[in-house]
Amino acid sequence: MAHQAHAYHMVDPSPWPLTGAVAALLLTSGLAIWFPFNSLILLTLGLVLLLLTMYQWWRDIVREGTFQGHHTPPVQKGLRYGMILFITSEVFFFLGFFWAFYHSSLAPTPELGGCWPPTGIVPLNPFEVPLLNTAVLLASGVTVTWAHHSIMEGERKQAIHSLTLTILLGFYFTFLQAMEYYEAPFTIADGVYGSTFFVATGFHGLHVIIGSTFLAICLLRQIRYHFTSEHHFGFEAAAWYWHFVDVVWLFLYISIYWWGS
């Protein structure tokens, strides 16, 4: 691209939105085929294409923002608004799951035995693994804030250490959640309780994996001297997203694990 003589956001022609859309189509189609037919071909294809798209698109944005200087103050302002709108859309996404949960639990139908949890369902103890998960995510919220303050104050080593700790806590949360799913006394097929529990907590788990990936990219960029104390919006966006994931978990814990049990 030729040098631009203005400060505004002019996007270069890019194939990655298209490949990302194709990857999303393959992933959803692959899931729909995997459940009834136990075939992983389409799902694997979608995952590979998604990973390639993520790598290439992130590389392009890092190049534009870090080395070509395209992320001027007006562009950063636009990116901030974009991230705020994205998180707002995610709030409404999770609102649907909470709506389904409260719709089912506040007025249980006779088919559920007129009670919540439904007859025959043994809920998980909210004061065991779920409480540990809450502590892990709250601790990761503290460490990501520590990383942010370290970057703003130019404390490079502290930023790397705190960011590494945040990512490790994120992966530990994912591991605990996977163990909980494996040992749960009910499944996604166990009526409305099973489906609302696994869909809500499952999508939250997916968001934790996405957030951990986002922070891992930020860690690599911090190691490679991409962030300065004034110019680090990539990290800020990841931190906002991580705090959003934290807050959603608190609502899930209070609603589904504690009150719902």
UniProtKB/Swiss-Prot annotation:
Membrane topology: Multi-pass membrane protein
Catalytic function, reaction form: 4 Fe(II)-[cytochrome c] + O2 + 8 H(+)(in) = 4 Fe(III)-[cytochrome c] + 2 H2O + 4 H(+)(out)
Major localization class: mitochondrion
InterPro entries cross-referenced by the UniProt entry: Cyt_c/ubiquinol_Oxase_su3, Cyt_c_oxase_su3_dom, Cyt_c_oxidase-like_su3, Cyt_c_oxidase_su3-like_sf, Cyt_c_oxidase_su3_a-hlx
Domain of life: Eukaryota
GO biological process: mitochondrial electron transport, cytochrome c to oxygen
Topology Mitochondrial intermembrane: residue spans: 35-40, 106-128, 184-190, 257-261
Keyword Acyltransferase attributed: no
Subcellular compartments: Mitochondrion inner membrane
GO terms of molecular function: cytochrome-c oxidase activity
Pfam families assigned: COX3 (PF00510)
Record keywords: Membrane, Mitochondrion, Mitochondrion inner membrane, Translocase, Transmembrane, Transmembrane helix
Mitochondrial matrix side: 1-15, 67-72, 153-155, 224-232
EC assignment: 7.1.1.9
Sequence intervals crossing the membrane: 16-34, 41-66, 73-105, 129-152, 156-183, 191-223, 233-256
GO cellular component: mitochondrial inner membrane; respiratory chain complex IV
Subunit structure of this chain's protein: Component of the cytochrome c oxidase (complex IV, CIV), a multisubunit enzyme composed of 14 subunits. The complex is composed of a catalytic core of 3 subunits MT-CO1, MT-CO2 and MT-CO3, encoded in the mitochondrial DNA, and 11 supernumerary subunits COX4I, COX5A, COX5B, COX6A, COX6B, COX6C, COX7A, COX7B, COX7C, COX8 and NDUFA4, which are encoded in the nuclear genome.
Function: Component of the cytochrome c oxidase, the last enzyme in the mitochondrial electron transport chain which drives oxidative phosphorylation. The respiratory chain contains 3 multisubunit complexes succinate dehydrogenase (complex II, CII), ubiquinol-cytochrome c oxidoreductase (cytochrome b-c1 complex, complex III, CIII) and cytochrome c oxidase (complex IV, CIV), that cooperate to transfer electrons derived from NADH and succinate to molecular oxygen, creating an electrochemical gradient over the inner membrane that drives transmembrane transport and the ATP synthase.
PANTHER family linked: CYTOCHROME C OXIDASE SUBUNIT 3, CYTOCHROME C OXIDASE SUBUNIT III
Family to which this protein belongs: Belongs to the cytochrome c oxidase subunit 3 family.
The protein's name: Cytochrome c oxidase subunit 3
Source organism per UniProt: Tetraodon nigroviridis
Gene encoding the protein: mt-co3
